[in-house]
Design a protein with these regions (language model features):
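Sec-dependent N-terminal signal peptides
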Residues: 6-14
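Alpha-helical interaction segments
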Residues: 11, 28-29
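Bacterial signal peptide processing site
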Residues: 21-25
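C-terminal motif of bacterial Sec signal peptides marking the signal peptidase cleavage site
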Residues: 16-20
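Positively charged n-region of N-terminal signal peptides that target proteins for export
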Residues: 1-4
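First exposed extracellular module after export/assembly in secreted or surface-exposed proteins
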Residues: 29-230
Length: 230
């Protein structure tokens, strides 16, 4: 009886370990389960040059709060492009694309509409001095569309020899200007309680077609196994 008890524990621990490696994100109730997951990626430009090789950086795909079919987030968590946008897709995981390619119908990229400074070039952008003051700044990749996408189960051999799903995303990125508006901070945030302070909040975007860029995000599903780590 004692031997059986010990064996049962070992089997349970081993099974739990295997499941935890393969299912790092719980997506069982997701309406987009056939898309959803963690994907280790590389990025290729329009000249077919690899501009970012595999190093463990990931894209994560998951359902929106509405949890409806073919509406999902694509989140470049390593901020390689960067990209974090909601996409409405048509098709199936084996062959899909954004249901709309029109800039005005696309959602904002949450990684690039943040208040300044967005990067070092904006370090000297002054804070607003009054309510309603506006500023427009050049920003990359304000919105994006999926031109072509494919997720194929169990066709990739990882660096460690394991089997994983393949990911192919050809995305078009739209750049332009992001406009921010000055709003008054909460009084508890003022350095001097008698002097009002203001901050920038996102207002809207405008599109510059001359700055369009297209990239391929290519990779495979994250396995969690040590031998597949970069």
């Amino acid at each position: 009886m004692k031997k059986f008890y010990i064996l049962s524990i070992v089997l349970c621990v081993s099974t739990s370990f295997f499941i935890s490696c393969q299912q790092d994100i719980e997506i069982w109730d997701s309406a987009t389960i056939d898309y959803s997951g963690r994907y280790v990626i590389k990025i290729i430009n329009e000249k077919q040059e690899v501009i970012h090789h595999y190093d463990g950086k990931e894209v994560r795909i998951y359902n929106t709060s509405k949890n409806i079919e073919n509406e999902l987030w694509i989140d470049d968590v390593g901020k390689l492009l960067p990209l974090k946008s909601k996409f409405m897709l048509s098709g199936t995981p084996a062959s899909f694309a954004s249901s709309n390619q029109d800039f005005n119908q696309l959602t904002d990229n949450l990684h690039t509409i943040v208040a300044p400074p967005f990067d070092k070039s904006e370090n000297k952008v002054p804070a607003p001095t009054k309510e309603g003051e506006t500023i427009s700044l050049d920003r990359p990749y304000l919105r994006a569309t999926v031109i072509e996408g494919k997720i194929i189960p169990k066709v990739v051999k990882t660096k460690g020899g394991n089997t994983a799903d393949s990911l192919y995303l050809k995305v078009k990125l739209f750049s332009g200007k992001a406009t921010f508006k000055g709003v008054q901070k909460a009084k508890t945030e003022w350095k001097d309680p008698n002097v009002a302070e203001y901050e920038w909040v996102f207002e809207n975007v405008s599109y510059d077609a001359s700055k369009d860029e297209t990239y391929v995000i290519s990779g495979h599903s994250y396995t969690g196994f040590a031998e597949d780590q970069y």
